[in-house]
């Protein structure tokens, strides 16, 4: 028992629980609603294993039940399950409403953070533009070129070839298992790539939400970073 490895993060604890109780916990995809009072069941079943403490179990449960994929699973008609996957009653309406509220608040926080990041980028770009303008103003004027003598042949300026616009390079998503709920990526649509956020990973593909608010299931070959 003394040589048991120690789980250092809540994500590692969740992965351990998903392996130990696969009918109850899941490491990816939509999660099933948990039985009320399942914390005490966990303490009795895994207490002492992997050097897990009650504090670690409580923190892992909090992270698991606040994730987007868990909140998506708390919906009308869903059944709570115990550690062995046995049904433990249908969800109450107040629990469904609370989960829906938590999900909307989480989405709003992501949108706020994204808007703040975009604002910082715009401010940095504007500041860089002002610095460039100041450098141009400080440059000394060029000396005037002497006029050419009359009759001298004037050289025709060479046409400047227009530079082709640089294509934005994207990295294709080769393995959906590396994606996480809430992660930002892009959805390919022809020659364009639209910003999107991962809502859940399903067996049919990845459900994403576009910046327009529309959600859809997209196959991995149409996703890029």
Swiss-Prot record:
Residues 103-173 are annotated as: Disordered. Belongs to the ProQ family. Residues 137-146 have a biased composition (Basic residues). RNA chaperone with significant RNA binding, RNA strand exchange and RNA duplexing activities. May regulate ProP activity through an RNA-based, post-transcriptional mechanism. Residues 109-118 have a biased composition (Low complexity). GO terms for cellular component: cytosol. This is RNA chaperone ProQ. The keyword RNA-binding applies. GO terms for molecular function: RNA strand annealing activity; RNA strand-exchange activity. Pfam families: ProQ, ProQ_C. Transmembrane segments: none annotated. The gene is proQ. Residues 147-156 have a biased composition (Basic and acidic residues). GO terms for biological process: post-transcriptional regulation of gene expression. InterPro entries: ProQ, ProQ/FinO, ProQ/FinO_sf, ProQ_C. It is found in: Cytoplasm.
